């Protein structure tokens, strides 16, 4: 039976590093700071840049949605400082699991390890489903699903997961090269959207930058932000509370930069390259989100972006540039390179668990 002392047992940094030198558990150190930066950008920027920006601007922040992304980036930057320090000190594949094991002990590490598995598994499922929907748009509206009696089989989602699984099995170097190509396409689509959107830009659409607060039944009750509940302001949209609510939503647009830390064990110089990769990817992503937000809210009035199904393409459609929707749909396929990069941390997070001395030996790299 586990004892309290055993549950609080920690694993030293030195032991964690020694475990990575075992012949059966050693990973190739192929990655550089550039590879990690590409990895981080590929994971963080998803189709949300085409949807989240429009919905947040139309229902919460108005033109100040760009400021909301800056506030969210600052919060992520503070978190990134912790990841950068831990990853450079403990350059092991387990990421938060390993960090918790070295500081809080075995029990907390066990909980965090399963949290990571759940997080990445759910992320892969959701993103694969989104990729399948965009594939349907590219195929002319034909949904990539098959109906087997009462069961609906999404072969598009299953196919992308299978392809990415095979790609990752070939090694991280090839996967990082594919990520580089996907990121190039992704950034190319974003730059094209910024250039075309700038032709419809009107500075008057950015006024007022922070719209006055107004009642909103959709932001009342359980749907209101914690800050609105604490201050007793009730269900309101826009204003400063709307801006802060938008920042909390925008924070989730940055989720994924932390997985760069899972590649520390495969990095040539983790003490130098992992922090560089984390902050470089975060900086690039922040610039992309802020630029898209500014162009979007400069193209149309924020009141024209209110609705459940508004996207970045909505702003172009209001100007008659419906052809941009096709570019966004095609561009969203490599954007969903997240399918390839979100699964990558899962085996990396799993890898350090079997190194525990009490792990089942068939699963252990010992």
Where is each model-derived feature located?
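Membrane-interface "cap" regions at the ends of multi-pass membrane proteins
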Residues: 1-54, 58-63, 77-81, 203-206, ...
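Hydrophobic, small-residue-rich membrane helices and short re-entrant helix-turn-helix hairpins
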Residues: 26, 170-183, 257-288, 354, ...
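Extracellular loop-to-transmembrane helix junctions
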Residues: 28-31, 41, 49-149, 241, ...
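Select transmembrane alpha-helical segments in multipass membrane proteins
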Residues: 30-40, 105-118, 156-160, 234-250, ...
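Membrane-helix boundary/coupling elements in multi-pass transport proteins
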Residues: 50, 78, 92, 115-130, ...
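Selective recognition of specific alpha-helical transmembrane segments in multi-pass small-molecule
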Residues: 74-78, 186-200, 254, 275-302
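TM-loop-TM module centered on a large, flexible mid-protein loop between adjacent transmembrane helices
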Residues: 98-99, 105, 136-147, 214-234, ...
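Membrane-interface loop-to-helix entry segments
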Residues: 152-214, 278-282
């Amino acid at each position: 039976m586990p004892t309290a002392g055993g549950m609080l047992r920690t694993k030293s940094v030195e032991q964690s590093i020694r475990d990575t030198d075992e012949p059966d558990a050693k990973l190739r150190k192929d990655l550089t700071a550039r590879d990690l930066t590409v990895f981080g950008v590929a994971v963080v920027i998803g189709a949300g840049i085409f949807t989240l920006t429009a919905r947040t601007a139309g229902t919460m922040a108005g033109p100040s949605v760009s400021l909301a992304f800056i506030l969210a980036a600052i919060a992520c930057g503070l978190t990134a400082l912790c990841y950068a320090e831990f990853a450079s000190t403990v350059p092991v594949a387990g990421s938060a699991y390993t960090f918790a094991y070295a500081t809080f002990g075995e029990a907390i590490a066990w909980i965090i390890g399963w949290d990571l598995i759940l997080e990445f598994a759910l992320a892969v499922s959701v993103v694969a489903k989104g990729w399948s929907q965009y594939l349907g748009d590219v195929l002319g509206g034909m949904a990539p699903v098959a109906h087997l009696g009462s069961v609906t089989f999404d072969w598009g989602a299953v196919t992308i997961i299978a392809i990415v699984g095979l790609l990752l099995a070939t090694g991280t170097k090839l996967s990082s090269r594919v990520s580089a190509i996907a990121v190039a396409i992704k950034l190319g689509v974003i730059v094209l959207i910024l250039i075309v959107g700038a032709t419809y830009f009107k500075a008057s659409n950015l006024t007022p930058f922070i719209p006055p607060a107004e009642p909103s039944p959709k932001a009342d009750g359980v749907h209101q932000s914690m800050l609105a509940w604490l201050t007793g302001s009730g269900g309101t949209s826009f204003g400063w509370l709307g801006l802060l609510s938008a920042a909390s939503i925008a924070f989730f647009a940055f989720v994924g930069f932390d997985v760069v830390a899972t590649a520390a064990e495969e990095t040539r110089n983790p003490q130098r390259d992992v922090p560089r990769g984390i902050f470089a990817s975060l900086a690039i992503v922040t610039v992309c989100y802020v630029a898209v937000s500014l162009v979007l809210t400069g193209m149309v009035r924020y009141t024209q972006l209110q609705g459940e199904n508004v996207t970045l393409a909505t702003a172009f459609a209001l100007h008659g540039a419906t052809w941009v929707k096709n570019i966004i749909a095609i561009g969203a396929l490599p954007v969903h390179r997240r399918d390839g990069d979100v699964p990558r941390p899962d085996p990396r997070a799993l890898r350090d668990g079997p190194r525990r001395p009490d792990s089942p030996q068939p699963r252990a790299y010992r």
